Amino acid sequence: MRAVLALVLLLSLAGCFSSPVVHFYVLASPEGEDISARDREAEGPRVAIMPVSLPGYLQRPQMVVRQGDDVDIRIEDFHRWGEDLSLGIARVLSLTMTRDMRSRRGVAMPLRTGAPADYRAQVDIRRFEGAPGGKVQLEAAWSLSRDGKTLRDGVFRTEGEAGASMADMIEAQSDLLEELGTELARTTLAADAGSSQAERGRDGRQSQSGGKKRE
């Protein structure tokens, strides 16, 4: 009898407590005019965003919050990404690059779309976390290549301040990715301008060579 009463008591207590709500988040798309790459025909440089690599501690659906120093992190079981983080990063980068290359009618797309590309951008995330009401940080190694040859590469570091909520932190992280996308767009346009100038130089030399008369 006591065992039955104990079970009833446990069930009653369980009914008094509701399970915590799990919140899901996605990275914010960059602001700007209509930048849907699928709706426009690229006439300028076309960039494929290669699959983004993440450090092991970020390869999880739960969000990661850094606690005060460089070694202490907290895994948030009730705050989760609503999309694969690497895919979300590629999405924000491609949209930002497309927006920032619009003056040259350039476009950037994740490689998985299968769209034709002149350049490939590789991004390896080394650090991408923060804390609500504190700092958010991004560190990423990147490279831009064409025809299998690396044209430019570097390490991008930036940080910002987040508001008090988890959503505020995601907004701040999205802003950091937008900064990286702008840097990649600027690099792509510079590399493409250099390639175009070199091609014009080769065409000019070939034209001059073809125009010489034989004696």
PLM regions: where:
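Sec-dependent bacterial lipoprotein signal peptides
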Residues: M1-C16
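Soluble periplasmic/extracytoplasmic beta-strand elements of cell-envelope proteins
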Residues: R46-V52, V64, R120-D124, Q137-S143, ...
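Sec-exported extracytoplasmic/periplasmic mature domains
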Residues: S94, T98-R102, A185-A193
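Surface-exposed short loop/turn segments
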Residues: F17-D34, A42, L95, D100-G148, ...
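A structural "domain/chain start" motif
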Residues: C16-L85, D192-E215
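Short secondary-structure boundary motifs at beta->alpha junctions and helix caps
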Residues: D70-G82, K149-R186
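Structured, soluble extracytoplasmic/luminal domains of envelope-associated proteins
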Residues: D77-M101
